[in-house]
Each structure stands twice: as structure tokens, then as C-alpha cells.
């Protein structure tokens, strides 16, 4: 503990607080430091240690562990989870053995699947598993440089913001670009007219996806032209692109079907093959015909197709993941002393509604909100009550059944001396 010198109050050399304003003041050779500054330094060192530990330790996760972690949150996409687990493991190896970075190329991923099948959730889950910064962008808002819209460099800015402007961490992050199918060029053949939101964006993304030193404006692209740029190397960033690619199944069917005429022709029904079976025959040429340029596809060596969710998959999504929707609502009711019960038939009815609306898993929450809205409004008055949801309530928009909770009988234990 520092003492007064010549009856003058001593102060911290860092925060300038005097010894009367802090609990302890420790003297050094030529200065003083207070207990508050020491705690702050310890906190900063610990945060830095955790950051470095996260970057170095995630490489030890084998593909099987990554696969299991994805399946704990994402339902019905086992094949896609396996493909992504291997791709991320390769990234981890590149980080652990830097000398292999030039020898082993990174595995950027293209996710193809219908809306609401879990593309975005898989990318978010991956970032959490390996504890790296994550940023998401919408391809529809991107335009070629010099036109009204968002520059591709702004995607990297979002990742930098997610990493608290720690460039080292940002350079090892994951970027997910959604709606990538919306930047397909308008025709299969190159056009004379400029396609600034289609092929132009694909061309702009080529360099940052392959790996380059990008100049990122810390305050956003065009509103602050005089700002200093931050240099970020995108070589080790993992890019995951996702899209529904509506209509690509027709391109695949046109390629795979052998058209014959006459009495020996095989007549196929449109329902002979479902969406998932058709996507299993996907080839790079099909994506080129859809509108992705070959150079852009070359930067996405790993292609994973996600299955269309059926009724059972949607029921599983409601109940099985760690953060399942039913578990979330049951916890909210529990906090107010109420009990929420879903009958099995009610869960099936919710899944059927989502299938009818063709919104996939994304539509489940909206349906639950509609079913539980009035009950949630009165939740604070439902202490010690049971709220039961049946199939009839879901189908006909009826009010939930509310009745007193069953009291558990307490069993008295005989105490022997």
C-alpha cells in the first residue's frame, strides 16, 4: 500500500485517481497503479487469452464432433452437416499448420436448398462451434462498385465489427452470403449491357473469396470518402453462400431425362422424383445454366444440397434441438409459474400448417405466436395453471385449454431415531 509523501495525496499513474478514491494504490519504481486499473488489466489480458485460445483450440475438433454439434441444432440435414464438418476441419488444419496454407486450398461452400430448410442456421452454428467471428450479408443488396447499392467490401466490414475490430480474429472468420441465387446473370450467354447487380457482383466477389488484401472503410463505403482504410487479408476467411435456386430442378430434369417418342417411350409422372432426389443429380453445369459464372463457381469447390423438410422433420424441429421452439415457450411459461403442454397431434397440425404455407421451419414460430398470442398476453395471471394445446385448437384457431395444475402429493418419510 502506498503512503503519503510530504502530506500530498498520491494518485494512480494510469487513471489519475488519488488514493482516497480507490481501495489500494501500489507503488512501483517511478509510478503508482490502483486496484481498479489492475482489475481492468487482468480483464483485458484474460479476454486476449480467451481470444487466442479459441483460435488455437478449435482446430482440435474432429469432423465427427463438428457434425454432432451441427445436428444438435439443425434437424434433417445430415448429409449437408457432414460435408460442412469436413470443410471446416480443413480450415482448422490450415490455421494450425500455417505452412500448409499455400498447399491446401480453403473449402468455400455453396448451400442449395428451399427456403426455411436451415441454410442460415447451419452457418451460424458453425461459427459458434469453432468460436470465430461471423457476419451475414444479403446478396440482393450488393452492386458493382460505382453504382447505387452496397459494395462487397462492406461484407468484410461487418465481419470486422463482429470481431470488435480485431483484424487478426476477423481474418479467420466466417462470412455467410444469403440469396446468392439472386445475383445470377440474366441469361446464360454474356450480355453486351452491364449487369451491375448480377454478373457484376459475382465478378466483384471473386477476389475477396479467393483471397486478397481488401481495403475496408471502417465507417462504411461511400458516405465518408476521406476516411483511412483498414487492410484485411481474406485468404483464410471461410465463405459460405446459400440460396434456394428456385427452378434449378427443371434444368437438372432437362439434362437427366432421356426423351423418346413412340410406343416404347417411358412416360414419367412429374411426381416420380421428389425435390431431394432431383438435387442429388446436381452438377456444376446446371448452376452455370442457372446463371452463376464459371469463375465464381470455381471459388466454391464444395457444394452441399439441403433436403426439403417433411412433416416429421418439422415436428422434430419443434421439439428436439437444444433451443427448440416448444422448449423456449415452455420455459417462458415456467418463469411465470404456468405449465405449457402440446399434444402430439397439435405438433403435427403445426407442421402441416407450415407445409401448406411453404415457409419451411421459418414459418413455425409465426404459427406458434398466433396460437399462443392471447395466452401470452394474460400469462402473468396464469400462475399454477396448465395451458394445453390440442390439434383442434391449432386447426380452428381456438383458445387454449386452461385448467389448474395437478398438485403433486408430498410423501412423508418416517424418521427413525
From Swiss-Prot:
Q: Where does Zn(2+) bind?
A: 12, 15, 34, 37
| Subunit-level organization | Component of the ClpX-ClpP complex. Forms a hexameric ring that, in the presence of ATP, binds to fourteen ClpP subunits assembled into a disk-like structure with a central cavity, resembling the structure of eukaryotic proteasomes.
Q: Which organism is it from?
A: Orientia tsutsugamushi (strain Boryong)
Could you tell me which Gene3D superfamilies the record lists for this protein? 1.10.8.60, ClpX chaperone, C4-type zinc finger domain, P-loop containing nucleotide triphosphate hydrolases
UniProt similarity note: Belongs to the ClpX chaperone family.
- What's the protein name? ATP-dependent Clp protease ATP-binding subunit ClpX
Instruction: Detail which positions bind ATP.
Output: 114-121
Q: Which residues, by range, are in coiled-coil regions? A: none
| Molecular function GO labels | ATP binding; ATP hydrolysis activity; ATP-dependent protein folding chaperone; protein dimerization activity; unfolded protein binding; zinc ion binding
Database matches in InterPro entries: AAA+_ATPase (IPR003593), ATP-dep_Clp_protease_ClpX (IPR050052), ATPase_AAA_core (IPR003959), Clp_ATPase_C (IPR019489), Clp_protease_ATP-bd_su_ClpX (IPR004487), ClpX_bact (IPR046425), P-loop_NTPase (IPR027417), Znf_CppX_C4 (IPR010603)
Entry-linked Pfam families: AAA_2 (PF07724), ClpB_D2-small (PF10431), zf-C4_ClpX (PF06689)
Which is a GO BP term held by this UniProt record?
Answer: proteolysis involved in protein catabolic process
**Domain ClpX-type ZB: where?**
1-53
**GO CC terms:** HslUV protease complex
| Upper taxonomic lineage | Bacteria, Pseudomonadati, Pseudomonadota, Alphaproteobacteria, Rickettsiales
State the function annotated in the UniProt record: ATP-dependent specificity component of the Clp protease. It directs the protease to specific substrates. Can perform chaperone functions in the absence of ClpP.
CDD domains in UniProt: RecA-like_ClpX
Q: Which UniProt keywords apply?
A: ATP-binding, Chaperone, Metal-binding, Nucleotide-binding, Zinc
Amino acid at each position: 500500500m502506498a503512503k503519503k509523501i510530504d502530506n500530498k495525496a498520491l494518485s494512480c499513474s494510469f487513471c489519475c485517481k488519488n488514493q482516497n478514491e480507490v481501495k489500494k494504490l501500489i507503488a512501483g519504481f517511478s509510478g503508482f497503479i490502483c486496484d481498479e486499473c489492475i482489475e481492468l488489466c487482468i480483464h483485458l489480458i484474460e479476454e486476449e487469452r480467451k481470444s487466442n485460445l479459441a483460435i488455437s483450440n478449435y482446430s482440435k475438433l474432429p469432423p465427427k464432433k463438428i457434425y454432432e454439434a451441427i445436428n444438435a441444432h439443425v434437424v434433417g440435414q445430415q448429409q449437408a452437416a457432414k460435408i460442412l464438418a469436413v470443410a471446416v476441419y480443413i480450415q482448422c488444419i490450415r490455421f494450425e499448420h500455417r505452412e500448409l496454407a499455400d498447399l491446401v486450398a480453403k473449402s468455400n461452400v455453396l448451400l442449395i436448398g428451399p427456403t426455411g430448410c436451415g441454410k442460415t442456421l447451419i452457418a451460424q452454428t458453425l461459427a459458434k462451434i469453432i468460436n470465430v467471428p461471423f457476419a451475414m450479408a444479403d446478396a440482393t443488396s450488393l452492386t458493382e462498385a460505382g453504382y447505387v447499392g452496397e459494395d462487397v467490401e462492406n461484407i468484410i466490414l461487418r465481419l470486422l465489427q463482429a470481431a470488435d475490430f480485431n483484424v487478426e480474429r476477423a481474418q479467420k472468420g466466417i462470412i455467410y452470403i444469403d440469396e446468392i441465387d439472386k445475383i445470377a446473370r440474366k441469361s446464360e450467354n454474356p450480355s453486351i449491357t452491364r449487369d451491375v447487380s448480377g454478373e457484376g457482383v459475382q465478378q466483384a466477389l471473386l477476389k475477396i473469396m479467393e483471397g486478397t488484401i481488401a481495403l475496408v472503410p471502417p465507417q462504411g463505403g461511400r458516405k465518408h470518402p476521406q476516411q483511412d482504410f483498414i487492410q484485411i487479408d481474406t485468404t483464410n476467411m471461410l465463405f459460405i453462400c446459400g440460396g434456394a435456386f428456385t427452378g434449378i430442378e427443371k434444368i437438372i430434369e432437362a439434362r437427366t431425362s432421356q426423351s423418346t417418342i413412340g410406343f416404347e417411350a417411358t412416360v414419367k409422372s412429374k411426381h416420380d422424383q421428389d425435390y431431394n432426389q432431383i438435387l442429388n443429380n446436381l452438377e456444376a453445369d446446371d448452376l452455370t445454366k442457372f446463371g452463376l459464372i464459371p469463375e465464381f463457381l470455381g471459388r466454391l469447390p464444395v457444394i452441399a444440397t439441403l433436403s426439403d423438410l417433411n412433416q416429421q422433420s418439422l415436428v422434430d424441429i419443434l421439439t428436439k434441438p437444444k433451443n427448440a421452439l416448444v422448449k423456449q415457450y415452455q420455459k417462458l411459461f415456467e418463469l411465470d409459474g404456468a405449465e405449457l403442454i402440446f399434444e402430439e397431434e397439435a405438433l403435427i397440425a403445426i407442421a402441416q400448417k407450415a407445409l401448406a404455407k411453404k415457409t419451411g421451419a421459418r414459418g413455425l414460430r409465426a404459427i406458434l405466436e398466433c396460437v399462443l398470442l392471447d395466452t401470452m398476453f394474460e400469462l402473468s395471471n396464469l400462475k399454477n395453471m396448465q395451458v394445453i394445446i390440442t390439434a383442434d385448437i391449432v386447426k380452428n384457431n381456438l383458445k387454449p385449454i386452461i385448467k389448474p395444475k395437478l398438485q403433486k402429493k408430498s410423501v412423508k418419510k418416517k424418521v427413525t431415531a
